[in-house]
Design a protein with these regions (language model features):
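Helix-start (N-cap) detector for alpha-helical repeat units in TPR-like alpha-solenoids
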Residues: 36-37, 70-71, 104-105
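Register position in tetratricopeptide repeats
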Residues: 48-49, 82, 112-119
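Conserved structural position within tetratricopeptide repeats
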Residues: 61-64, 97-98
Length: 126
């Protein structure tokens, strides 16, 4: 009987620990997404001023904070494309599409990227 009670107590303890772990992870994720969003917004602001390297830095930071943030990868791809780094642009577009395959903006940007590279015969943009 004591063994059964001990096992039930341990099971409840494990359930509580699991729930607490899940709940504590949620705010951390929300904070990471919020911080990533701030980096993306700042990146947009500096890109509009022509500061593309700073924008790349900000969008890279956003992807580090939240590796699931497809829009950050899309913006990063645009910046790499602008800077002429077509290999990195392609990689960033592909990552964005893997994260959000049905996002029409990302699909449109990727399709335009491919079309331009096909038309100009650039091999590094595939």
């Amino acid at each position: 009987m004591a063994t059964i009670v001990a096992e039930q107590t341990m099971q409840r303890f494990l359930v509580v620990v699991t729930l607490l772990s899940a709940l504590s992870a949620a705010p951390a994720y929300a904070d990471a997404r919020g911080d990533a969003r701030k980096q993306v917004e700042f990146g947009i602001a500096v890109a509009q001023k022509g500061l593309w390297r700073e924008a790349i830095f900000r969008w890279l930071r956003a992807t580090e904070l939240d590796p699931t943030y497809a829009q950050a990868f899309n913006n990063l791809a645009i910046a790499y494309e602008h800077e002429g780094d077509l290999v990195k642009a392609r990689e960033a577009y592909e990552k964005a599409l893997r994260l959000e395959p049905n996002n029409p903006l990302i699909k449109q940007n990727h399709d335009l990227f491919k079309e331009i590279n096909d038309r100009t015969g650039r091999k590094d943009g595939r």
